[in-house]
């Protein structure tokens, strides 16, 4: 099912969303959740609480979208078998497990990630991500790419680092670094560059 065909749901609080998650089949396509912005007339579950509920049930948050001035939406889906884990979500899960909030489906996702190495390979949040030595070396060998990398906005910088981190083998990592450095050397970026103000 395409993401624009998913239902848009509103939950008042965490127990309501948890009850919905518990009733979903393993092959659920997911849903968009509607969240109130500050000052909205209708309160909803907070995005942070919804993420906790989702992780506890083996689901994960994804794409964001605007609804109007009072509400925004986020897509929630069951976690795919090989999907990457973030360090932030790993820490959330550890807190939820300590509180006894992890469901059997959530535990199965965690156990599988630990068994196949995705748990240990969790990626750093954007605020803490930094280039590894192999990427630094490749950038140093290509001054134009280094200059473009130094000027990237935070979204483009993180997009480069994330793609390198997601390479599964040393050969795949080397290939990905070469592709990204060549892209930067051409003055290209993953996301369109934002116009500078001023």
Predicted features along the sequence, with ranges:
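Charge-dense, helix-prone N-terminal extensions
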Residues: 1-198
